[in-house]
Amino acid sequence: SLMVRLAADPSTALRLMAEYPEPFSACEVGEIMAVLRRGMLPIAYEPLIGSPSRNLRIVGLNIVRQFGIEEAERLLLRIVSGDEDPELVREALYTLCALRRPLTRRAVSGRLSAMPPAERKALLRYVVAEGYSPGPLRRLLDERERPYYESL
């Protein structure tokens, strides 16, 4: 129903997304991104990322990732270093990877070390898929993870 309402009146998109009662699923975010790519929802990423609404922040991060907006790096690092929502932090880390930004910063390494092992392993697979060289990232990996990362 959200997508129907967005299509009917795109000018209410931000309000509708912010008021949506449940966290967006990956499918819902994908549908919103498809509408954005078609140019039907003219939305800027910065107000979304800075919004108090979790759903708007997730959409903002996806806009940055999909459109390769490197200028958002400062906002991404702010989320990584200080946000309390683990899902937003994870999405910001994946977005930094998608933009191929340096991951050896203190904020990033601190969050990586605090991640649960399964999430950290998934992120390492994504880092490899994005083409990061193992050399500079060695200091982010503990001894057990280095062989796994290098085997990918």
Question: What spans do the regions from the language model cover?
Answer:
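Structural detector for internal amphipathic alpha-helices that build alpha-solenoid repeat scaffolds
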Residues: 1-8, 15-38, 46-50, 55-69, ...
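Helix-capping and short linker residues that terminate individual alpha-solenoid repeat units
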Residues: 84, 101-104, 116
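Core helices of alpha-solenoid repeat scaffolds
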Residues: 10, 38-42, 73, 105
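Surface-exposed flexible segments
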Residues: 73-74, 79, 138-140
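Alpha-helical repeat scaffolds
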Residues: 16-17, 45, 107-112, 137-145
